Amino acid sequence: MKGGKKLKDLYSPEAYQRISAYFKDSLKTALALYQNMKPGFLTALLYPKMMTCSSTISVDEAIMNLAHENNIGISGFETMAMQAAVFDSIPYEKQAEELLKVIDSIGNSLIQFKLMLQAYKDQQLHDIEKIINDPVFGVEEDRDLLLDKRNKHWVEQLKEIMKKGTVFIAVGAGHLVGKNGLIELLRAEGYTVRGLENRE
């Protein structure tokens, strides 16, 4: 974090202890290891814990592994520095509140995460948007920063990338939905966007 701020500086001793206990008991790691990390990044560490499958790798990793195995080139929309800048735009105190809220309501967070996965499998875009706007996810207030502006930037990149041939594009579900989601932005640019049958 900027200015030498530490994670423990953002919480009361009691709140910090609640987060520390969760990381120790549920994530099997010490919160002390993450003192310099932005709370928004720490919130992202919680999502694998909400997964019901036994896989130890993320979807991103699985896709990258497939690409490497088949000698397919990979490129990203953003650098780590660009992603960090997004979180620097949101006050650390606000990020800290969101992290605590997710941990304190972990039961509801788990339910919403499972609903999100099912809505994604069923290609129910309206349901996905409704879920990401739930206060549990802490996205709605900062949607412009976390999703909309980034989507618009990504579409400009995609217009150039797709000129080169067939591409596989993987993004988080939240980036797909809404009037400023990638689906509608691509349609506005004249692209035909349709769902494919989900075969399990």
Question: How should these model regions be labeled?
Answer:
Residues 1-145:
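Structured, acidic catalytic/metal-binding patches in enzyme active sites
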